[in-house]
Amino acid sequence: MLTLIQGKKIVNDLRSRLAFEYNGQLIKILSKNIVAVGSLRREEKMLNDVDLLIIVPEKKLLKHVLPNIRIKDFSFSIKVCGERKCVLFIEWKKNTYQLDLFTALAEEKPYAVLHFTGPVSYLIRIRAALKKKNYKLNQYGLFKNQTLVPLKITTEKELIKELGFTYRIPKKRL
């Protein structure tokens, strides 16, 4: 367990240190492409882990980011890692914390931010209402009859409004 303040400090420390190896080169992950999600974004007082969403600029890089993740000046071990999710244990100020990393393409960002921020109860209500209209919402997009529904949105707030719901800041979601 860690406090919200500790979680925010860890994220600040990580922002300039995340990179991945690709074709023998170390590619820095830009701070603007790192989004705090989960209980940290909802500003819960106590956190079980730190959740970060990494926005990947090109589809061809997606399969390389998490399996080849590097954190400058941090000691870490990988519990499990795939193309879209990686669970790490990081050493920070003499303690070990769980860091969950997720990836999304730029066009998936609003959906992924909503999905990984939650909370689950909030997402269940939204998805249930959409299901009645034959839509499916997940971290990759909005679908109708298994076909992606293109929406001209770039933020989670725009997504919520486009779906016909009232936007609530993450810490006010139930």
From Swiss-Prot:
The keyword Calcium does not apply. Residues 42-51 are annotated as: Involved in ssDNA binding. SUPFAM superfamilies: Nucleotidyltransferase. Disulfide bonds join 81-86. It comes from the Viruses. One of its GO terms (molecular function) is metal ion binding. GO terms for cellular component: virion component. Mg(2+) binds at residues 49, 51, 100. It is found in: Virion. Pfam families: DNA_pol_B_thumb. Small DNA polymerase formed from only a palm and a C-terminal subdomain. The total DNA-binding site of pol X is composed of two DNA-binding subsites. This is Repair DNA polymerase X.
